[in-house]
Amino acid sequence: MFNKRAFEMVSNEQIKKSFGERYDYSNPDFRGGFKIRFSPRRATKYSAAYDLYSPIEVVLKPGEIAKIPTGFKIKMPHNEGFFIYIRSSLGTKDINLPAGVNIIDSDYYDNPDNEGHFFIAIKNNSEKEFKIEQGDRIAQGVFQRYYTCGDKPISIRMGGFGSSGK
């Protein structure tokens, strides 16, 4: 069991696989700059949530859903999850998370499919095009402890986004 929580960048290979041509890798120290600009972080000393940033520009047409790669994976204790919510400022513009909340389980970390690289699915429910700029805060995440009722797990995670239960 992990005792500490941490946001870690996924490998260069995973970043290139997830971002493709949507990110500029020309800077030899792109990892350092990426980490400084887009690492999840709390805005104030007592903020409960970590702000989550879009490393890429995305234009969402009305009704469109985009899966935005973050470039990060999350290490956390096995009795916790990382719960992702839309920023309230986006909710007032009719932009939301299709599932209401995205939940990252602790066993998502380092999964063989995508190293635990977490994405944020966002939907434009408005009737207008909506643009997310590179560096915009798009969501916020909270570490939350959970409890089980003693049931036995039926499988071990082997995949990435949307893989549990398959």
Predicted stretch roles:
Residues 1-166:
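DUTPase catalytic domain/fold
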